[in-house]
Amino acid sequence: MPSVSAVILKLAAAALSALLLSGVAANATSRIKDLANIEGVRQNQLIGYGLVVGLNGTGDTLNNIPFTKQSLQAMLERMGVNIRGATIRTGNVAAVMVTGNLPAFATQGTRMDVTVSALGDAKNLQGGTLLVTPLLGADGNVYAVAQGSLAIGGFQAEGEAAKITRGVPTVGRIANGAIIEREIEFALNRLPMVRLALRNADFTTAKRIAAAVNDFLGTKSAEPIDPSTVQLTIPAEFKGNAVAFVTEIEQLQVEPDQAAKIIIDERSGIIVMGRDVRVATVAVAQGNLTVSISESPQVSQPNPLANGRTVVTPNSRIGVTEDGKKLALVKDGVSLQQLVDGLNGLGIGPRDLIGILQAIKAAGAIEADIEVM
């Protein structure tokens, strides 16, 4: 008869196994909330022009940046200080652009974050304060007003013969630095229907979302319009209460589908491949041809009293080396992991892998779309 401790261990192992399996199953599905947005519910970009003051001599050079000088004069005149014709010498002011995103359903009096970026030749915005800056939308209306002290992620220090910079000291952020003054009207509760806009357009995913909604409601209220849009007719029991309807729909679980795709960033050498990438039978060989040229000119210096001249004789050395690589056979239908393991076995780096993947695609042996960024 097994001991009590053995039984407890078996029960614990079974519970852990069930937990792991449930985690795998949960990872296979996602909430509709994570797959799609409600059409019309979005952020709006705001932008404004302003001045940052209080800089420790790291602001704009007024003689080189005329718009900073003009803005400073206009601001002081609005405050009753007339400096027309006077010589202004200060390095504590910088012209900046202020940007931010107006959240959906934002109400008057709430706050939002803003980003402040130098527009002139300011070296550092550290320690600066943004003066009152109206933030405009694309329609030209003022939706928020920003002001506050900047938080800078980088820094710059310099001496007479050296300078060091970390990060970007000419860009800062003000948390909750803008107050919203105008709301954007969006009467969600009065809509007879809402549309779901998929973040990643896909026919299969759109159909699955519609099926999940219809199964939940027991009616044909959802219809996929195209790969990126699912139209939802609000049922009678939710009329005038679209918020409750959307809340219920967002929590439904759907298994998303996606096309096999390979993303390549040639600038950084980053390669990202989806799990559904498959490769047909193909042979791969890769070799690097390196040509190196070194110049070591020889200088003939005559005796100072010989009345001769200095002669420079060029001396070039050219070397060619080629890395011998084996021919690798990639079998039909291999998975992503097998493909990566096989190419790594050839000693291929990320940048060489970019060319190989493009060549395999050109040969018609790779079952995926390649997107080069």
Swiss-Prot record:
Q: What is its main location?
A: periplasm
- State the Gene Ontology terms under molecular function: structural molecule activity
Tagged with keyword Signal: yes
Q: Name one GO cellular component term.
A: bacterial-type flagellum basal body, distal rod, P ring
One Gene Ontology term from the biological process aspect of the record: bacterial-type flagellum-dependent cell motility
Tell where it localizes: Periplasm; Bacterial flagellum basal body
Q: Does the keyword Lipid metabolism apply?
A: no
Q: List where this protein forms a coiled coil.
A: none
| Secretion signal span | 1-28
User: Which keywords belong to this entry?
Assistant: Bacterial flagellum, Periplasm, Signal
User: PANTHER family of this UniProt entry?
Assistant: FLAGELLAR P-RING PERIPLASMIC PROTEIN FLGI, FLAGELLAR P-RING PROTEIN
Instruction: Identify the HAMAP family for this entry.
Output: FlgI
For this chain, the family text in UniProt reads: Belongs to the FlgI family.
Please describe what this protein does. Assembles around the rod to form the L-ring and probably protects the motor/basal body from shearing forces during rotation.
Instruction: Summarize the subunit comment.
Output: The basal body constitutes a major portion of the flagellar organelle and consists of four rings (L,P,S, and M) mounted on a central rod.
Protein name stated in the entry: Flagellar P-ring protein
Q: Which organism is it from?
A: Rhodopseudomonas palustris (strain HaA2)
State which gene encodes it: flgI
